[in-house]
Amino acid sequence: GKWVMTVFNSYQWDLNYRNPAVLIEMIDIILFWANKGADILRLDAVAFLWKKMGSACQNEREAHLLLQLMKDCCQVTAPGVLFIAEAIVSPGEIAKYFGEDAINAKECEIAYNASLMALLWDAVATKNANLLNRGVKNLPDKLERATWLNYVRCHDDIGLGFDDNDARLSGYDPAQHRRFLVDYFTGKFPGSPARGLPFGDNPKTGDTRISGSLASLVGLEAALESQNEDAIEAAIRTIVLLHSMILSFGGIPLLYYGDALGMLNSLEYLADPFKRHDNRWVHRSHFDWNKAEKRRQSGTVEQRIFSALKKLIALRKETTPFADLDNRQLLATENPNLLVFSRTDTQNSRNRVLVAGNFNVAAQTLNIGTPRSHGFFQQDTMKDLCSGTRVVAENDAVIIPPLSFYWLTD
Protein backbone atom coordinates (compact mmCIF):
# COMPACT_ATOMS: atom_id res chain seq x y z
CA GLY A 1 0.00 0.00 0.00
CA LYS A 2 0.92 3.65 -0.39
CA TRP A 3 0.36 6.68 1.78
CA VAL A 4 -1.13 10.03 0.81
CA MET A 5 -0.87 13.26 2.79
CA THR A 6 -4.08 15.05 3.73
CA VAL A 7 -3.27 18.20 5.70
CA PHE A 8 -6.84 19.47 5.90
CA ASN A 9 -9.43 16.79 5.14
CA SER A 10 -9.26 13.08 4.37
CA TYR A 11 -10.93 13.71 1.01
CA GLN A 12 -8.44 16.47 0.09
CA TRP A 13 -5.27 14.78 -1.08
CA ASP A 14 -2.20 17.02 -1.14
CA LEU A 15 -0.47 17.20 -4.51
CA ASN A 16 3.08 15.98 -5.00
CA TYR A 17 4.87 18.79 -6.80
CA ARG A 18 8.09 16.78 -6.90
CA ASN A 19 6.46 15.16 -9.92
CA PRO A 20 6.91 17.61 -12.86
CA ALA A 21 3.70 16.33 -14.41
CA VAL A 22 1.76 17.69 -11.43
CA LEU A 23 3.21 21.19 -11.82
CA ILE A 24 2.61 21.16 -15.57
CA GLU A 25 -0.99 20.05 -15.05
CA MET A 26 -1.59 22.79 -12.47
CA ILE A 27 -0.15 25.45 -14.77
CA ASP A 28 -2.37 24.09 -17.54
CA ILE A 29 -5.42 24.51 -15.28
CA ILE A 30 -4.40 28.08 -14.39
CA LEU A 31 -4.00 28.99 -18.05
CA PHE A 32 -7.28 27.26 -18.93
CA TRP A 33 -9.18 29.59 -16.62
CA ALA A 34 -7.15 32.58 -17.77
CA ASN A 35 -8.20 31.72 -21.32
CA LYS A 36 -11.82 31.62 -20.15
CA GLY A 37 -11.48 35.23 -19.00
CA ALA A 38 -10.74 34.87 -15.30
CA ASP A 39 -9.04 38.02 -14.04
CA ILE A 40 -8.13 36.83 -10.54
CA LEU A 41 -7.30 33.34 -9.30
CA ARG A 42 -7.32 32.45 -5.61
CA LEU A 43 -4.55 30.00 -4.73
CA ASP A 44 -5.60 28.05 -1.66
CA ALA A 45 -3.24 27.13 1.19
CA VAL A 46 -0.11 28.18 -0.68
CA ALA A 47 2.00 27.86 2.47
CA PHE A 48 1.49 24.08 2.32
CA LEU A 49 2.51 23.48 -1.30
CA TRP A 50 5.79 21.71 -0.58
CA LYS A 51 6.31 18.69 1.68
CA LYS A 52 9.62 17.80 3.26
CA MET A 53 10.30 15.01 5.73
CA GLY A 54 11.32 16.28 9.14
CA SER A 55 9.84 19.73 8.58
CA ALA A 56 6.52 21.38 9.43
CA CYS A 57 5.75 21.40 5.67
CA GLN A 58 4.87 25.10 5.85
CA ASN A 59 6.47 28.10 4.17
CA GLU A 60 9.18 25.99 2.54
CA ARG A 61 11.44 27.74 0.04
CA GLU A 62 10.22 25.39 -2.70
CA ALA A 63 6.64 26.63 -2.18
CA HIS A 64 7.79 30.11 -3.18
CA LEU A 65 9.68 28.76 -6.18
CA LEU A 66 6.56 26.95 -7.36
CA LEU A 67 4.52 30.15 -7.13
CA GLN A 68 7.21 32.04 -9.03
CA LEU A 69 7.07 29.43 -11.79
CA MET A 70 3.28 29.66 -11.96
CA LYS A 71 3.43 33.45 -12.08
CA ASP A 72 6.18 33.45 -14.74
CA CYS A 73 4.12 31.17 -16.98
CA CYS A 74 1.07 33.35 -16.47
CA GLN A 75 3.03 36.54 -17.13
CA VAL A 76 4.06 35.24 -20.55
CA THR A 77 0.62 34.06 -21.64
CA ALA A 78 -1.92 36.07 -19.61
CA PRO A 79 -0.13 38.99 -17.91
CA GLY A 80 -3.40 40.57 -16.77
CA VAL A 81 -4.27 37.69 -14.44
CA LEU A 82 -3.73 38.32 -10.73
CA PHE A 83 -3.07 35.75 -8.00
CA ILE A 84 -4.53 35.87 -4.50
CA ALA A 85 -2.42 34.11 -1.88
CA GLU A 86 -4.46 32.37 0.79
CA ALA A 87 -1.66 31.99 3.32
CA ILE A 88 -3.01 31.95 6.85
CA VAL A 89 0.35 31.89 8.58
CA SER A 90 2.36 34.14 10.90
CA PRO A 91 2.52 37.87 10.05
CA GLY A 92 6.17 37.73 9.01
CA GLU A 93 5.51 34.89 6.56
CA ILE A 94 2.38 36.21 4.85
CA ALA A 95 4.08 39.12 3.09
CA LYS A 96 6.66 36.76 1.56
CA TYR A 97 3.94 35.42 -0.74
CA PHE A 98 3.95 38.73 -2.60
CA GLY A 99 7.41 37.70 -3.78
CA GLU A 100 10.87 38.99 -3.05
CA ASP A 101 10.75 41.68 -5.72
CA ALA A 102 8.57 42.90 -8.55
CA ILE A 103 10.55 41.40 -11.45
CA ASN A 104 12.73 38.38 -10.72
CA ALA A 105 10.74 36.72 -7.96
CA LYS A 106 7.15 37.73 -8.47
CA GLU A 107 4.50 35.58 -6.78
CA CYS A 108 1.05 36.91 -5.83
CA GLU A 109 -0.41 40.40 -6.21
CA ILE A 110 -2.98 40.04 -3.42
CA ALA A 111 -2.83 38.32 -0.04
CA TYR A 112 -5.34 37.81 2.74
CA ASN A 113 -4.47 40.13 5.62
CA ALA A 114 -5.04 37.39 8.19
CA SER A 115 -2.91 39.23 10.74
CA LEU A 116 -5.16 42.30 10.74
CA MET A 117 -8.22 40.06 10.98
CA ALA A 118 -6.87 38.26 14.06
CA LEU A 119 -5.81 41.55 15.66
CA LEU A 120 -9.26 43.07 15.15
CA TRP A 121 -10.89 40.09 16.85
CA ASP A 122 -8.45 40.45 19.73
CA ALA A 123 -9.61 44.05 20.16
CA VAL A 124 -13.24 42.91 20.22
CA ALA A 125 -12.57 40.45 23.05
CA THR A 126 -10.19 42.57 25.14
CA LYS A 127 -12.10 45.82 24.55
CA ASN A 128 -8.79 47.55 23.88
CA ALA A 129 -6.43 48.16 20.96
CA ASN A 130 -3.20 47.35 22.76
CA LEU A 131 -2.18 44.29 20.73
CA LEU A 132 -3.90 45.69 17.64
CA ASN A 133 -1.66 48.78 17.68
CA ARG A 134 1.50 46.76 18.20
CA GLY A 135 0.58 44.21 15.55
CA VAL A 136 -0.32 46.83 12.94
CA LYS A 137 2.92 48.69 13.67
CA ASN A 138 4.90 45.51 13.03
CA LEU A 139 3.07 44.35 9.91
CA PRO A 140 5.75 43.71 7.27
CA ASP A 141 5.98 46.11 4.36
CA LYS A 142 4.48 44.95 1.11
CA LEU A 143 5.70 45.50 -2.42
CA GLU A 144 4.34 48.55 -4.23
CA ARG A 145 2.66 46.40 -6.87
CA ALA A 146 0.88 44.27 -4.25
CA THR A 147 -2.09 44.82 -1.98
CA TRP A 148 -3.85 43.33 1.02
CA LEU A 149 -7.26 41.71 1.09
CA ASN A 150 -8.69 43.05 4.35
CA TYR A 151 -11.51 41.13 5.97
CA VAL A 152 -13.37 40.56 9.23
CA ARG A 153 -14.89 37.18 8.38
CA CYS A 154 -14.65 34.67 5.56
CA HIS A 155 -15.83 31.11 4.89
CA ASP A 156 -13.10 29.62 7.10
CA ASP A 157 -12.46 29.51 10.82
CA ILE A 158 -10.69 32.31 12.68
CA GLY A 159 -7.04 31.54 13.36
CA LEU A 160 -5.39 33.58 16.08
CA GLY A 161 -2.29 34.28 14.01
CA PHE A 162 -0.84 37.28 15.77
CA ASP A 163 2.88 37.41 16.54
CA ASP A 164 3.86 35.83 19.88
CA ASN A 165 6.40 38.54 20.62
CA ASP A 166 3.81 41.25 20.00
CA ALA A 167 1.58 39.47 22.52
CA ARG A 168 4.37 39.37 25.11
CA LEU A 169 5.18 43.04 24.62
CA SER A 170 1.47 43.76 25.10
CA GLY A 171 1.63 42.07 28.49
CA TYR A 172 0.16 38.69 27.54
CA ASP A 173 1.40 35.14 27.71
CA PRO A 174 0.75 34.07 24.07
CA ALA A 175 -0.65 30.61 24.87
CA GLN A 176 -2.80 31.81 27.76
CA HIS A 177 -4.07 34.76 25.75
CA ARG A 178 -5.10 32.54 22.85
CA ARG A 179 -6.94 30.31 25.32
CA PHE A 180 -8.74 33.38 26.67
CA LEU A 181 -9.75 34.39 23.14
CA VAL A 182 -11.09 30.92 22.35
CA ASP A 183 -13.00 30.86 25.64
CA TYR A 184 -14.35 34.36 25.00
CA PHE A 185 -15.60 33.70 21.49
CA THR A 186 -17.10 30.32 22.39
CA GLY A 187 -19.00 31.89 25.29
CA LYS A 188 -17.09 30.10 28.05
CA PHE A 189 -15.53 33.24 29.48
CA PRO A 190 -17.77 34.83 32.15
CA GLY A 191 -19.82 37.67 30.71
CA SER A 192 -19.02 36.88 27.08
CA PRO A 193 -22.01 37.29 24.72
CA ALA A 194 -20.27 35.42 21.88
CA ARG A 195 -21.76 32.25 20.36
CA GLY A 196 -18.80 30.77 18.48
CA LEU A 197 -17.68 27.14 18.31
CA PRO A 198 -14.16 25.74 18.84
CA PHE A 199 -12.68 24.28 15.66
CA GLY A 200 -9.62 22.11 15.01
CA ASP A 201 -8.60 21.71 18.62
CA ASN A 202 -5.05 20.31 18.75
CA PRO A 203 -4.22 18.84 22.19
CA LYS A 204 -0.51 18.61 21.28
CA THR A 205 0.01 22.24 20.35
CA GLY A 206 -2.92 23.75 22.21
CA ASP A 207 -4.00 25.41 18.96
CA THR A 208 -7.73 25.98 18.60
CA ARG A 209 -9.55 28.10 16.07
CA ILE A 210 -13.03 29.59 16.07
CA SER A 211 -16.12 29.07 13.92
CA GLY A 212 -19.15 31.34 13.89
CA SER A 213 -20.78 34.18 12.01
CA LEU A 214 -19.69 37.74 12.62
CA ALA A 215 -23.03 38.68 14.17
CA SER A 216 -23.06 35.72 16.56
CA LEU A 217 -19.44 36.28 17.57
CA VAL A 218 -20.02 39.94 18.51
CA GLY A 219 -23.08 39.09 20.61
CA LEU A 220 -25.99 39.92 18.31
CA GLU A 221 -27.49 36.43 18.56
CA ALA A 222 -27.48 36.51 22.37
CA ALA A 223 -28.78 40.09 22.41
CA LEU A 224 -31.72 39.27 20.14
CA GLU A 225 -32.61 36.24 22.23
CA SER A 226 -32.68 38.33 25.41
CA GLN A 227 -34.30 41.28 23.59
CA ASN A 228 -31.71 43.55 25.18
CA GLU A 229 -31.73 46.76 23.14
CA ASP A 230 -28.48 48.04 24.62
CA ALA A 231 -26.73 44.77 23.73
CA ILE A 232 -28.23 44.83 20.23
CA GLU A 233 -26.92 48.36 19.74
CA ALA A 234 -23.46 47.36 21.01
CA ALA A 235 -23.33 44.41 18.60
CA ILE A 236 -24.36 46.57 15.64
CA ARG A 237 -21.80 49.21 16.58
CA THR A 238 -19.10 46.53 16.73
CA ILE A 239 -20.01 45.19 13.29
CA VAL A 240 -19.86 48.68 11.78
CA LEU A 241 -16.65 49.56 13.65
CA LEU A 242 -14.86 46.46 12.35
CA HIS A 243 -15.88 47.22 8.79
CA SER A 244 -14.83 50.85 9.16
CA MET A 245 -11.33 49.58 9.85
CA ILE A 246 -11.04 47.26 6.84
CA LEU A 247 -12.56 49.89 4.55
CA SER A 248 -10.07 52.58 5.57
CA PHE A 249 -6.93 50.50 6.23
CA GLY A 250 -5.61 50.33 2.67
CA GLY A 251 -6.14 47.40 0.34
CA ILE A 252 -9.20 45.58 -0.97
CA PRO A 253 -11.99 45.24 1.60
CA LEU A 254 -13.76 41.89 1.58
CA LEU A 255 -17.29 41.62 2.96
CA TYR A 256 -18.47 38.10 3.72
CA TYR A 257 -21.97 37.22 2.55
CA GLY A 258 -24.62 37.82 5.19
CA ASP A 259 -22.47 40.08 7.36
CA ALA A 260 -24.10 43.22 5.96
CA LEU A 261 -27.42 41.87 7.25
CA GLY A 262 -26.30 40.49 10.60
CA MET A 263 -26.86 36.85 9.63
CA LEU A 264 -26.54 34.58 12.67
CA ASN A 265 -25.17 31.09 13.18
CA SER A 266 -27.20 28.36 11.51
CA LEU A 267 -27.42 24.77 12.72
CA GLU A 268 -28.87 23.45 9.47
CA TYR A 269 -25.54 21.75 8.70
CA LEU A 270 -26.11 19.24 11.53
CA ALA A 271 -28.80 17.54 9.44
CA ASP A 272 -26.32 16.86 6.62
CA PRO A 273 -24.13 13.78 7.25
CA PHE A 274 -21.43 15.23 4.97
CA LYS A 275 -21.25 18.49 6.93
CA ARG A 276 -22.13 17.72 10.53
CA HIS A 277 -18.53 16.94 11.51
CA ASP A 278 -17.26 20.33 10.31
CA ASN A 279 -18.71 23.14 12.41
CA ARG A 280 -17.45 25.81 10.00
CA TRP A 281 -20.74 25.21 8.23
CA VAL A 282 -22.35 27.10 11.11
CA HIS A 283 -21.38 30.29 9.25
CA ARG A 284 -21.85 28.88 5.74
CA SER A 285 -25.62 28.57 5.72
CA HIS A 286 -27.90 29.14 2.75
CA PHE A 287 -28.49 32.83 2.19
CA ASP A 288 -31.66 34.01 3.91
CA TRP A 289 -33.48 36.11 1.33
CA ASN A 290 -36.37 36.83 3.70
CA LYS A 291 -33.88 38.33 6.12
CA ALA A 292 -32.39 40.30 3.24
CA GLU A 293 -35.75 41.91 2.54
CA LYS A 294 -35.81 43.31 6.07
CA ARG A 295 -32.99 45.68 5.09
CA ARG A 296 -35.72 47.76 3.43
CA GLN A 297 -37.71 48.13 6.68
CA SER A 298 -36.70 51.14 8.75
CA GLY A 299 -35.45 50.35 12.24
CA THR A 300 -34.79 46.64 11.74
CA VAL A 301 -31.42 45.20 12.71
CA GLU A 302 -30.85 44.33 9.07
CA GLN A 303 -31.60 47.89 7.93
CA ARG A 304 -29.39 49.45 10.59
CA ILE A 305 -26.37 47.35 9.63
CA PHE A 306 -26.94 47.39 5.86
CA SER A 307 -27.49 51.14 5.60
CA ALA A 308 -24.41 51.89 7.72
CA LEU A 309 -22.14 49.66 5.64
CA LYS A 310 -23.63 50.91 2.38
CA LYS A 311 -22.79 54.47 3.43
CA LEU A 312 -19.23 53.52 4.39
CA ILE A 313 -18.68 51.82 1.04
CA ALA A 314 -19.94 54.91 -0.82
CA LEU A 315 -17.60 57.14 1.20
CA ARG A 316 -14.70 54.76 0.62
CA LYS A 317 -15.23 55.00 -3.15
CA GLU A 318 -15.00 58.80 -3.21
CA THR A 319 -12.23 59.30 -0.62
CA THR A 320 -8.95 59.34 -2.55
CA PRO A 321 -6.64 59.08 0.51
CA PHE A 322 -8.03 55.56 1.05
CA ALA A 323 -6.31 54.35 -2.14
CA ASP A 324 -3.68 51.75 -1.29
CA LEU A 325 -0.47 53.62 -2.07
CA ASP A 326 1.53 52.79 1.05
CA ASN A 327 0.16 56.00 2.55
CA ARG A 328 -0.94 54.81 5.98
CA GLN A 329 0.76 56.14 9.10
CA LEU A 330 0.00 54.70 12.53
CA LEU A 331 -0.22 57.45 15.17
CA ALA A 332 0.75 56.78 18.76
CA THR A 333 -1.86 57.66 21.38
CA GLU A 334 -1.87 57.67 25.15
CA ASN A 335 -5.14 55.74 25.14
CA PRO A 336 -4.74 51.94 24.66
CA ASN A 337 -8.41 51.58 23.67
CA LEU A 338 -7.95 53.48 20.41
CA LEU A 339 -6.49 52.65 17.00
CA VAL A 340 -5.53 55.87 15.21
CA PHE A 341 -3.90 56.22 11.80
CA SER A 342 -3.75 58.73 8.98
CA ARG A 343 -4.26 58.27 5.23
CA THR A 344 -2.94 60.86 2.79
CA ASP A 345 -3.64 61.49 -0.88
CA THR A 346 -0.24 60.97 -2.51
CA GLN A 347 -1.15 63.52 -5.21
CA ASN A 348 -2.32 66.17 -2.75
CA SER A 349 -0.85 66.05 0.75
CA ARG A 350 -3.50 68.48 2.03
CA ASN A 351 -6.17 65.89 1.28
CA ARG A 352 -6.02 63.43 4.16
CA VAL A 353 -8.12 61.50 6.62
CA LEU A 354 -7.58 60.77 10.30
CA VAL A 355 -9.08 57.39 11.23
CA ALA A 356 -9.80 56.81 14.92
CA GLY A 357 -11.54 53.70 16.26
CA ASN A 358 -12.67 53.11 19.85
CA PHE A 359 -12.87 49.42 20.77
CA ASN A 360 -14.03 50.00 24.34
CA VAL A 361 -17.62 49.82 25.59
CA ALA A 362 -17.17 53.25 27.20
CA ALA A 363 -16.51 56.61 25.54
CA GLN A 364 -12.80 57.34 25.19
CA THR A 365 -10.67 60.46 25.00
CA LEU A 366 -8.30 61.08 22.10
CA ASN A 367 -5.61 63.59 22.97
CA ILE A 368 -5.07 65.57 19.79
CA GLY A 369 -1.42 66.40 20.49
CA THR A 370 -0.03 63.71 18.20
CA PRO A 371 -2.60 64.25 15.41
CA ARG A 372 -1.96 67.99 15.60
CA SER A 373 1.78 67.44 15.19
CA HIS A 374 0.92 65.61 11.95
CA GLY A 375 -1.17 68.52 10.64
CA PHE A 376 -4.62 67.61 11.94
CA PHE A 377 -6.83 69.78 14.20
CA GLN A 378 -4.99 72.98 13.31
CA GLN A 379 -8.22 74.90 14.01
CA ASP A 380 -9.47 72.60 16.84
CA THR A 381 -12.20 71.26 14.58
CA MET A 382 -12.51 68.66 11.83
CA LYS A 383 -15.33 67.16 9.78
CA ASP A 384 -16.42 63.56 10.30
CA LEU A 385 -17.03 62.11 6.84
CA CYS A 386 -19.53 59.56 8.12
CA SER A 387 -21.91 61.85 10.01
CA GLY A 388 -21.14 65.04 8.09
CA THR A 389 -20.83 66.94 11.38
CA ARG A 390 -17.95 68.92 12.83
CA VAL A 391 -15.95 67.33 15.64
CA VAL A 392 -14.60 69.98 18.00
CA ALA A 393 -11.60 69.47 20.26
CA GLU A 394 -12.03 70.80 23.78
CA ASN A 395 -9.05 71.08 26.11
CA ASP A 396 -6.94 69.41 23.42
CA ALA A 397 -9.13 66.30 23.42
CA VAL A 398 -11.87 64.67 21.38
CA ILE A 399 -14.41 62.24 22.83
CA ILE A 400 -15.07 59.11 20.76
CA PRO A 401 -18.33 57.32 21.69
CA PRO A 402 -18.33 53.64 22.73
CA LEU A 403 -17.55 51.12 19.98
CA SER A 404 -17.41 53.93 17.44
CA PHE A 405 -15.06 55.59 15.00
CA TYR A 406 -14.34 58.80 13.17
CA TRP A 407 -13.12 59.42 9.64
CA LEU A 408 -11.93 63.00 10.12
CA THR A 409 -10.88 65.46 7.44
CA ASP A 410 -10.19 69.17 7.16
Could you tell me what each predicted segment is?
Residues 1-410:
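Active-site and adjacent substrate-binding regions of carbohydrate-active enzymes
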